[in-house]
Curated annotation (Swiss-Prot):
Mg(2+) binds at residue 26. PROSITE patterns: G_TR_1 (PS00301), G_TR_2 (PS51722). Monomer. Residues 10-215 form the tr-type G domain. Residues 175-177 are annotated as: G5. It comes from the Bacteria. This is Elongation factor Tu. Residues 137-140 are annotated as: G4. GTP binds at residues 19-26, 82-86, 137-140. NCBIfam families: EF-Tu, PRK00049.1, PRK12735.1, PRK12736.1, small_GTP. PANTHER family: ELONGATION FACTOR TU, MITOCHONDRIAL, ELONGATION FACTOR TU-RELATED. It catalyses: GTP + H2O = GDP + phosphate + H(+).
Amino acid sequence: MAKGEFIRTKPHVNVGTIGHVDHGKTTLTAALTYVAAAENPNVEVKDYGDIDKAPEERARGITINTAHVEYETAKRHYSHVDCPGHADYIKNMITGAAQMDGAILVVSAADGPMPQTREHILLARQVGVPYIVVFMNKVDMVDDPELLDLVEMEVRDLLNQYEFPGDEVPVIRGSALLALEEMHKNPKTKRGENEWVDKIWELLDAIDEYIPTPVRDVDKPFLMPVEDVFTITGRGTVATGRIERGKVKVGDEVEIVGLAPETRKTVVTGVEMHRKTLQEGIAGDNVGLLLRGVSREEVERGQVLAKPGSITPHTKFEASVYILKKEEGGRHTGFFTGYRPQFYFRTTDVTGVVRLPQGVEMVMPGDNVTFTVELIKPVALEEGLRFAIREGGRTVGAGVVTKILE
């Protein structure tokens, strides 16, 4: 299971690609690994096919699952998620984007911003991605430099609309495909040897400089939302996810909180990251935790692992919510008390019933409102927790828990 120990030397930052389908997110992800690998023997190259794994996706050329790759610059170690681009897979986008200290927004220069470009910027805002760097891709397909300036202006405007600092955001122009083709021909191509490869370096520099090393919540009590669970024969059950805060090491007692009627305690018997054993997992790490005496059925996606007593399951809360306009992909009509959408917390959807405050008859798309929610299953909740409101697989609102009621 583990091969060698993961040594922590450089600061670790989580990034990922977002943007419209077929604008080049996966090709760019591959190019980043190739370019970084030419200057650092520790980096493993990944090709488009490696990142775009599941067979049914390849046929349509659409990435569905969230792929994780790693690369390094002289300054930092990066974990990079390639987020699904297709609208049907927003659920993955929500979990994927939640794992980013900064996002690389890929926009095709030939098309300019498209509906999913807007949707992904909105999602990044909702799930709290703090920084965005823009890679304007496919610039080799546009002859008119004025057109490139126009696309850049549109992207900056769009970022401003969703409260990102559109005027300050770095925008790098390049071609992921031409850089990747060059790296395939000459895998040792270094900085300064090819104009397209240099554009990828320009992007890496921008990520290094513009996305700050996150201030990790290491000193808070341990919490990790469970994303996936699997069994390792002879060793037990492993829960994977990104540590939201605190730290965890072998021998620590943790609680499994949410979804189940009872909160249960267990002990962590192993910590792993990228298939290597880790002395200690800290906030921001994507890890697998081996849990003592817990069967595959007793822990599931949507629960959290947490320091005992630090967080409790709740079903009723008050929230401040923004309901998307029709133009933003939201509902076309208003809703009343008794509305039952899904509430997407951390890694899962839970159905809940909305109660509007006294004097509010109806909530319309575009409204900002405070209401109470009663969930059908308990979730590990606390004030300040963000969530998405969804129905029929699409996001119709975004909110934040303002008060726990029960």
